[in-house]
Amino acid sequence: MAKKSKIAKDKKQREIVAIYAEKRRALKEAGDYQGLSSLPKDASPVRLRNRDSLDGRPRAYMRKFGVSRITFRELAHKGEIPGVKKASW
């Protein structure tokens, strides 16, 4: 489990990206790179890190399910992910 401060920081950063998204798009289309550089650093979507939606783990993130491999395994064993079952052959 990630530190609560990291999870909170990630949430705040995503909100900032959403707030400035339209303004960034307009500045990029206009080619106003000076204006882009005046925006906050955290307004750039490139700085976001994919994190597990349940416990905030930043590594081994599975984009399709939005969780880390560890959480995915636990949820799959419990049968809480539709269409996923243990392989058997």
UniProtKB/Swiss-Prot annotation:
Domain of life: Bacteria
Keywords, in A-Z order: Ribonucleoprotein, Ribosomal protein, RNA-binding, rRNA-binding
Record Pfam families: Ribosomal_S14
Cellular component GO terms held in the UniProt record: cytoplasm; small ribosomal subunit
GO MF assignments: rRNA binding; structural constituent of ribosome
Single GO biological process annotation from the record: translation
Quaternary state and interactors: Part of the 30S ribosomal subunit. Contacts proteins S3 and S10.
Described function: Binds 16S rRNA, required for the assembly of 30S particles and may also be responsible for determining the conformation of the 16S rRNA at the A site.
Sequence similarity: Belongs to the universal ribosomal protein uS14 family.
NCBIfam families named in the record: PRK08881.1
Protein name according to UniProt: Small ribosomal subunit protein uS14
Gene that produces this protein: rpsN
